UniProtKB/Swiss-Prot annotation:
Active site residues per record: H167, D390
Pfam entry (one): Transferase
PANTHER family: ACYL TRANSFERASE 4, OS10G0105900 PROTEIN
Protein name (database record): Spermidine hydroxycinnamoyltransferase 1
Coiled-coil spans in chain: none
Function: Hydroxycinnamoyl transferase that catalyzes the transfer of an acyl from p-coumaryol-CoA to spermidine, to produce coumaroyl spermidine. Can use feruloyl-CoA as acyl donor. Contributes to the natural variation of spermidine-based phenolamides in rice cultivars.
Domain of life: Eukaryota
Amino acid sequence: MKLDSFMVTRRGNPELVAPARATPRGTKPLSDLDDDWDLRYLQPCLEFFRAVDDGERRKPARPGDAIRAALAEALVYYYPIAGRLRELPKGGRLAVECTGEGVVFVEAEADVRIEDLGEPPLPTFRGAESFLCDVGDAGVVVGRPLFYMQITHLKCGGFVLGTHICHCIADAFGTLQFLKAIVDIARGEAKPTTLPVWEREHFVATSLPPNIKEEQEKLFDELENTTCDDIMVTMPAENMVSEYFTISQRDMIALRRHVPFNLTKTVTSFELLTAVLWRSRTMALGYKPCQIVRLMITVNARGRWKKLPLGYYGNGLLCPVIEITVNDLCTNSLGHTIELVRKAKHEMKTKENMQLMVDLLPLWREKPYIKVERIFETCDIKWIGQDTLDIGWAKRIGGGIPTVSLPDMTSYQFMCKNEKGDHILVFHTTNAVMHLPLVIKRK
């Protein structure tokens, strides 16, 4: 069957699923890391499952009922997700009101088999919109449900879980933890194998040293008084197109041949691919040699920051920024760019630098209208653990982020499996980057 021809033949009415039992009421503050203007949107995700019979756990007669019940039970533990974001009277900050109102759940059916979606399904997950709830404006997060789930039943007995979650509540690792809680309970566990921890106070800003604050104010003045000439900022959103590329193990070997000998044994796939993409993107966009270009990468604070407790599901990704002129980036070697990426990663792994980045966030929150020009944002989510989504009576065969669009323009790097079962790297970029220095197989 051609994928273009499939359609969701039935979609039920959206319903609110509340926690299965009474949960605490009250207000929970967000961290300064959560309450970032750039995180005020609903992040989509797709997970594809094939029905299996393992002999011990047979598929329920109505998988949708089992998932709905598991969702309600998971919300007993993750009860803030069943609440609503409210804006506080002062400063425009957000907080979660734990109201127990619930999350949105939809059941649907599609006239298609799991193998018709790809063996296995790979981005761009064509037809992805059919597997996701209609959330309206994904950039509006106040006063609305914080989580949406659609289960689409397929002809073969498999199904697709399409979700949206408010990024202010959880990052990729936290979202996976919540999904795993639902899956654990659907598998038959009495409770999630990892119990959630809120504790957003771990990422609260302290006072800034005067010299740092002064430097930041100068940067704001410079950005506010500069006329924007970056096509990636001025181009209308409707003209932006998401593009996904896959990198096989053979492709990575080819890329590594361009790495200096002293780095070949230690460079990570993230460092290498990020360096290649940043350089290629900069060249493709035609920036002037004297202009400053920036790279923003993500560093996971888990395991590094004040011993974050097991079960913490809030935002824990910090984003150092590298600045360099176009000339210096493009005329120096690939090894030089890799060293820049590596240096930024390692410098951000100190508690002092992590705290400084959190301390700067309130200043940026006061100026949400400021757009940083010529910046490439990339995020490594290869190892968040999606393969651990084990329902028992259904096996996850693929999934990931289906679309990337405004307000989120991040280039995500994540892992999938190809038709041979081998792991391949998937990355996203915009349609402006069409001329990579190496031929990369495009799916």
